[in-house]
Amino acid sequence: NIHHASRENNTFRTALWTGRHVQLTVMSLQPGEDIGLERHPHTDQFLRIEQGVGVVQMGEDKSNLNFQHYVGPGTAILVPAGTWHNLINTGSTPMKLYTIYGPPNHPHGTVHQTKADAEKEHN
């Protein structure tokens, strides 16, 4: 049950399943925390908010995020490959979400307890 797995997750990111062409991860963003401005050159991404509120930003250039939209439970976000994007928790409770990458974006079994852990691995 992805809804339950998302809401029960307390890690910044955990890869629950990794196939040859897609990957499912769950994430938890603390109040004021963001995913971090990023771009996946060859990976499409689908995100669904299960709990919490925030803002999604997207654009073709990281200095021009010309799309901004408020998000909440039930919001689905589609990020085309090559698009700069960020998701920010603007609420007072943790934001819980799941994301599907195609193709996979993280090694099988990835667990990042915190955003800092994710950034260490990425750099």
Give, region by region, the residue ranges found by the protein language model:
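Double-stranded beta-helix
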Residues: 4-7, 88-123
